[in-house]
Amino acid sequence: MLNNFLNLELLNISLSYPFLFLITTAIVLLLCSGFWKFHRSFYIGISSLSLIVSAFLILNNANAQGLEAKAFLATLNNDIVSFYASLVILCFSFLYLLMQKEENQGEFYALFLFMIASLLLMVSSSNLVLIFIGLESSSLALYTLIAMRGSDNAISSAIKYFSIAAVGAGFFVMAVAFIYLKTGTLDLSANLALKNEFQKDPMLLGAGVMIFVLCAIKLSLAPFHFWLKDVYYAAHTNLVAFISVVPKVAMLVVVIRLFDFLNNTGFEYIIIVLAIFSMLIGAFAALSQNNIKKMFAYSSVVHSSLVLIACIPLLKEQNFDGILLAIFGYWTLFAFANYAVFMILSNYENNSYESLNGLLVKKPLIAFCLSISVLSLAGIPPFGVFWGKFMILNTVILNGYWYLALFVALSSVIMLYAYLKILIHVLFMKNDRVYNIKFSFIQNFILAFCVCVSIFAILLML
């Protein structure tokens, strides 16, 4: 074992370069910020460049070693799941950095890079210990970022998020202990040969349920979503856009690996009930909100539930590549529309619906961008999220879960009323206030790009 560990060829250290580079950059930024003060553009430039280099290293590894490479005694995987997830994480982290307007603290960007490195570690491993290390490292950094930016309630909301997630982490650790007790291994991919034992042993199935509790908390699935509304309301608006997309990508990878591990065990019935319950609770709760950010908090519950539904066929060993395309396709299209909405909302201190009154008259171009993005999130054709939802429905129906499509349609109709409330205020309500909406050239470009993706997403289907 020791000889294997010292064998550099088996270690394959190059697979760890993407997140090691981010960690090194974060340490340098942290040291620099302790001795010198730099402008925000310096921190954004260095952080953005490090993300680009990390993406290049991932692409280089995929080109040189393919998508079956392993490292550190097969605890790190360069498979198709980690490849796509890593690129999505880096892409939307890069966009988030370019959306920054005010943050000048070097510690903020150092913590941000530490978090992204932890997320990359998390999606690149099927080893439960490394997944837990990546999860907790990224979560601790995220709690701090929430507390550093936002309203006066940001600290209390971060503590609430931390407290609820700590309970989920306890379930995860106990589940890991149960799995190791029964199988003698901590690798999810190694356990795939033990499906028959899973069917017979309630302890192992219970361990899978306990792991999923933490996944549900991080994906903000009902009834594990109680932290979400407070965080959305208190955190800085641009950070909310990031929270709603990037950390959930890493958690989706854990769900994909877990479901691939638990297939043919009867676990699917638990997930089906939870997904339907979560989707409907989120949709009905969104209708009753008077604050836009809180409405989008419950909207994200619905979107997370939809992606969970796309994962369900994995529990029956169905077409893996097709399911993966539906999951990442939907989430990417959702992310672009979501970023556009929150970029516009970041200009408002008051996120009530009334604050959007008269936007069409005063800022018609901004009103157009907001309307297109909201229609996309609502799943109205021919805009982006509609095609993502189409891929999910196609996947679940082809795999025999046609009844889930009915609940998806019901939740979509309910959410349509919540989204239309925004459009009514933007397009038809009058207001004499002066809108002070300012974007830099880069931010204007990001907004235009996100809206164009929503408009021309149909081209991706060809």
UniProtKB/Swiss-Prot annotation:
GO terms for molecular function: NADH dehydrogenase (ubiquinone) activity; NADH:ubiquinone reductase (non-electrogenic) activity; quinone binding. The keyword NAD applies. The chain crosses the membrane at residues 15-35, 42-62, 80-100, 113-133, 161-181, 204-224, 239-259, 267-287, 295-315, 323-343, 366-386, 396-416, 441-461. Its EC number is 7.1.1.-. This is NADH-quinone oxidoreductase subunit N. Belongs to the complex I subunit 2 family. It comes from Campylobacter jejuni (strain RM1221). One of its GO terms (cellular component) is plasma membrane. Keywords: Cell inner membrane, Cell membrane, Membrane, NAD, Quinone, Translocase, Transmembrane, Transmembrane helix, Transport, Ubiquinone. GO terms for biological process: ATP synthesis coupled electron transport. Pfam families: Proton_antipo_M (PF00361). NDH-1 is composed of 14 different subunits. Subunits NuoA, H, J, K, L, M, N constitute the membrane sector of the complex. NDH-1 shuttles electrons from NADH, via FMN and iron-sulfur (Fe-S) centers, to quinones in the respiratory chain. The immediate electron acceptor for the enzyme in this species is believed to be ubiquinone. Couples the redox reaction to proton translocation (for every two electrons transferred, four hydrogen ions are translocated across the cytoplasmic membrane), and thus conserves the redox energy in a proton gradient.
